[in-house]
UniProtKB/Swiss-Prot annotation:
Name the record gives this protein: Small ribosomal subunit protein uS13
Stretches for region Disordered: 94-118
A GO MF label: rRNA binding
Key words, A-Z: Ribonucleoprotein, Ribosomal protein, RNA-binding, rRNA-binding, tRNA-binding
Subunit field text: Part of the 30S ribosomal subunit. Forms a loose heterodimer with protein S19. Forms two bridges to the 50S subunit in the 70S ribosome.
Pfam families tied to this protein: Ribosomal_S13
Amino acid sequence: MARIAGVNIPDNKHTVISLTYIYGVGRTTAQSICAATGVNPAAKIKDLSDEQIDQLRNEVAKITTEGDLRREINMNIKRLMDLGCYRGLRHRRGLPVRGQRTKTNARTRKGPRKPIRK
């Protein structure tokens, strides 16, 4: 198994699919990485040379991935909450942030139903 950005990449899958195992790298980003390095997206990781894997590693290092990306996302949410803006308040209360209805739906975000106390 090749190790890129601190993640074990599966050997028996295509390069494009294997790169998506890295948090922050989707199909489109994986295809652009393959194009930038000149690696065949349909080639399996086990068939690549060490030089090609190093090229992939260097290209992935240019992108914010894994822990840094998670930290950045959490800092953005924390910033909204500290500002006290509408989106920050919705995050703080655990409600949907992007304008979805909450009268009947939003059970995932709100959690299980709470019984009405009399």
